[in-house]
């Protein structure tokens, strides 16, 4: 039916994800078998676009099994799916209570989000873009229950949510659901009405609202924008850059190319093939001088800087304009995304630390924006005196952003305003680049000593984004909330994750070289910055700081979950544990963690893990609790 109507379908893998599938390997093996069997049967169907390998694994079970182990299990399913059907897209439908459970190898980030406030929804979408890293963001579920909120309120919410998803550059959104008739756990659910159709098949007002919805782009600031590209010996690169700029959808902009003393005929190439470009020829002067010369030649109210190895997206300017409309920011920028690698060395460089990255203080306010994707008002640029000429190859953007902040001006981040940025083509070229970055950081250290530690490392107030999805890793600190019941469970990592190796070049050679580069890169930069070479770094602690003593299970025939058992224990003097701890309750030296397993029937099983010098007391108390429940 979907094929007949020109529709694409995302399938969902049905398996026992609501159980401790790591302790019951048969459940996880059955999931692998079901995925393989399903892909063999319908994987080539023209209407199948992709597969969700899981959907909202319960947060208490994730804590019970271990967040990192669950993430790895989800990644195994995705890897299996990709190996059997590489033409399909694979993802995991996550939700805010396990925000940290993002698989590294998914093709896109998917979140089920149910928020009733437009401002809260928009704010959370901005956050999800940062969790997604370089990947597209899909809202895999959004809806509102008309039984509790009313038909008109449902229509209103679905309308603004669809517009918000468009404004904030999601790759798509799935509305839940088409009909009020739906099943869960083998039974029809009769007390929720999320559908666009009621139980008789009649259309609700929400369907009419969506049918008449005309999505529109957010209003942008008027005025001429000047795109400035500086190049030196970039003849092989700049053609693709200028072709991408020429194809941009915005019409009110000009392009200035500054040739910084090229010896390979770059300027002549630009003049011949791109006559619409304003070309400035300089003697070799350095990157900062070239950028300042471009700004002097430009006529626009806003100056947009990018590099000759970048290819701006078609909506680049269109997405930047609204950020300047309210005069909230003096400068804005967006991500610089590496294209798919063409060789194994490009794949290693793409996954290595040290690439130009934005630094964010929160979901919108930036501390640093790389010069390859930096837009600044002419007023702010002239107030700062442009770029500092002493920075000839790198570091100019860091210095410029720091001076903007020191002057009390604000920098904003726009997730949808991205440029494709080719990384260095070889490992040797990449390491030479890192040496250059280290030299630039030495200049920054001399000019901004207060922004560096005593050891010579930059003291960023915000987080440096590495391009990978924000996910649980060794040493992660997860803010579970009291007894693991926080609705939004955020994560704090010692470092934000990098991109993974591209699947096409994921080999032993690539992994070996990536490990070598990960050792060399920070040490080369540190040596060039302050002549300090660190061989070993302190390792982060594991998630489990206290080893458990034992485990057992309790039956709950009436279907009561862990909350009932925890409440009874609290009446016996047990207290909620720390909000970032993997334990629910504590009493003296005792600790307890619980999770709920549910099947298709009405009953449940409570999983209990405990720690303490005399665990029999905990066991006795829990047995008493079981009888009372």
Give the ranges of each region predicted by the language model:
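Aromatic-rich peripheral "rim/lid" segments of glycoside hydrolase catalytic domains that contact
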Residues: 10, 176-224
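Extracellular glycoside hydrolase catalytic/binding regions
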Residues: 63, 69-167
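Short, acidic, metal-binding catalytic loop of nucleotide-sugar glycosyltransferases
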Residues: 243-252
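A conserved acidic beta->alpha catalytic loop
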Residues: 244, 259-268, 310
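Glycine-rich, basic loop-to-helix element that forms the pyrophosphate-binding segment
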Residues: 282-298, 360, 372
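Short aromatic/hydrophobic "clamp" motif used to bind/position activated sugar donors
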Residues: 303
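Conserved donor NDP-sugar-binding/catalytic core segment of glycosyltransferases
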Residues: 315-346
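Short, flexible, basic/aromatic active-site loop/helix in glycosyltransferases
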Residues: 334-335, 349-367
